[in-house]
């Protein structure tokens, strides 16, 4: 009895002994509780649902980066065009807000911001012509090209829609009425050539400017050349676009990017601008701001890889082999 009394007294003095009497003797199963009931059946479903959402996010993350990159490009570029042109109407603003150079800076800032947003995620193509050129010369997977281009075009649609919504009252005043929509304001979003330009001249202007753009993109991303660090690449593209706008931008409004023209043009069609968007100059929308930039980007990439690229990241391998033989000859 005295031994039993000592055990009872020690148990009463040790608080852990009381806690231990509350714990179950056997380990709990993952779906059981202390009361022996099941967990809420929705818990596994919620976990599975979150995993599915994460998988979807991972699958669309790169195309979404392209989407937001192009949307930003249009917001800055078309937004600057709207501000400069619409402000020339005295009923919209007391004085003009900018010049053609302001529009050049707007598009240049747009390309820089778009690449900063998307560059570390998707590569920052934000241009179907560049995406196709990267697939041709830099091993970008062709299976990803359709999703990138779709995202880029949709980004152009949404970006144009946001700018249009922001300036809709100024557009109404500029056009002279809510239901009046003409090329005068359509040209703030989509590209149109100057009246004296021939079809061949329009094509050549877009081809040339995009070839320069593509060659510079390949140079700026060539680690064997004096390429900037990844964080400074958008700034280099900013300088490039200011130069392109200042030198080759007047005649066709320098699309250089199928998504930059076709996306906003699709939005304008939905906004009531009519068939003239696509009938202009015998389907100008197709051969000038789409086909010419795609071919120009191919030409720029071909020229860079043929004459300047010395690496093994191009399908044009003979330049690399020739350079290695030359270096070996110098050593010997």
Swiss-Prot record:
A motif (NPA 2) lies at residues 257-259. GO terms for cellular component: plasma membrane. The keyword tRNA processing does not apply. The chain crosses the membrane at residues 67-87, 101-121, 145-165, 200-220, 231-251, 284-304. The keyword Repeat applies. Induction: Expression is induced 4-fold during ectomycorrhiza formation. Expression is highest at 15 degrees Celsius and decreases at any other temperature. InterPro entries: Aquaporin-like, MIP, MIP/Aquaporin, MIP_CS. It is a multi-pass membrane protein. A motif (NPA 1) lies at residues 127-129. It comes from the Eukaryota. Keywords: Membrane, Repeat, Transmembrane, Transmembrane helix, Transport. GO terms for molecular function: glycerol channel activity; water channel activity. It is found in: Membrane. Residues 1-20 have a biased composition (Polar residues). Residues 1-66, 122-144, 221-230, 305-332 are cytoplasmic. It catalyses: H2O(in) = H2O(out); NH4(+)(in) = NH4(+)(out). Aquaporins contain two tandem repeats each containing three membrane-spanning domains and a pore-forming loop with the signature motif Asn-Pro-Ala (NPA). Water channel required to facilitate the transport of water across membranes. Acts as the most efficient Laccaria water channel. In addition to water, also shows strong ammonium transport activity. May be involved in fungal nitrogen (ammonium) support of the plant host in symbiosis. Belongs to the MIP/aquaporin (TC 1.A.8) family. This is Aquaporin Lacbi1:317173.
